[in-house]
Amino acid sequence: MDLLGHVGTREVIQDMDVMRAVLGDPKLSYLGYSYGTRLGSAYAEKFPQNVRALVLDGAVDSSQDPVQESLRQAAGFQGVFTAYATDCAKNADCPLGTDPAQAVARFRELVGPLEQTPAPTADPRGLSYNDAITGVQQALYSDELWEILTQGLSELRGGNGDTLLQLADMYDGRRQDGTYANTQDAFNAIRCVDDPRITDPAVTGRQDSEYRKAAPFLDDGKGTGAAPLELCAAWPVPNTSTPHRISAPGLPPTVVVSTTDDPATPYQAGVDLAAQLGADLITFRGNRHTAALVAGDRCLDDAVINYLVDLATPAPGLTC
């Protein structure tokens, strides 16, 4: 129980500053992705005088409450699903058909039956509905996985769930021996201690309805306007943060990278975080979650490296 109160962002940024001091660095140079952007922005707010260079890619906007963040992310995943379906439709054998306007309906026809009967797989577990959705979402994190997603949906159309189950296992951190990494559990523990809890069933009901509207490809059509309370509602320790705009007077020039079609941390979150920090915003055009030094884009990588090494700020309005 004591541990649960000390795994959140508040404690981690203190640890980061201790590590900086122990290593003998007068100031911190930091590149953070996804949740790492929350760590970076929180560190900047707490220790602006200790920052040398800060690059935040795939922004978590701390001014958003959990409901707002969830709905923004739902819309992000829907946008990337639409982009995938449009790309897939260029091929006559696309499992979602050649009309992107019908892609959601075709997708629901493929995954809906899994709610009653899992698809067979070489693994004795079979492919459940939840695993299918998880596998699809994993593939939407990067357009490098779209070809594999097409393979998985084509297999499902033929009654086989192997590839989608492999994608779900990738997301969940499942090892070959059947054990799992603790990544998802750790993420739940962190967000539950960081953020305010939603304890009103009416709020979760409205959130569920709005989520279905924002991401129709994830809507099973069974929404009633009611929904169970989420895991964090029963978390046994108080939350340590509330939504707020980041304020970091004295912070040196920093950089935020935001991808136009990022499903998990949508583009606008990066725009908003850059404004709060007074940071230079680099826009990356692509369909993926985070891009700096991982997408293989010379324009973006050069700008980030030049800043981290030489503190050379990117050109205003840089788009890569």
Please name every model-derived segment.
Residues D2, I13-K27:
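Conserved acidic catalytic loop of the alpha/beta-hydrolase fold
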Residues D25-Y35:
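Alpha/beta-hydrolase fold nucleophile elbow
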Residues S34-L39, F47, D261:
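Active-site loop->helix "elbow" adjoining a glycine-rich segment at hydrolase catalytic centers
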Residues A44-R106, Q151-Q176:
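A catalytic-pocket lid/entrance helix-loop region that shapes and gates access to the active site
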Residues V104-L251, V294-G296, D302:
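Alpha/beta-hydrolase fold active-site neighborhood
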Residues G250, V255-S258:
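Short beta-strand/loop motif that positions the catalytic acidic residue
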Residues P263-Q268:
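Conserved alpha/beta-hydrolase "acid-adjacent" motif
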Residues R285-C320:
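Catalytic active-site module of serine/aspartate enzymes centered on a nucleophile-bearing elbow/loop
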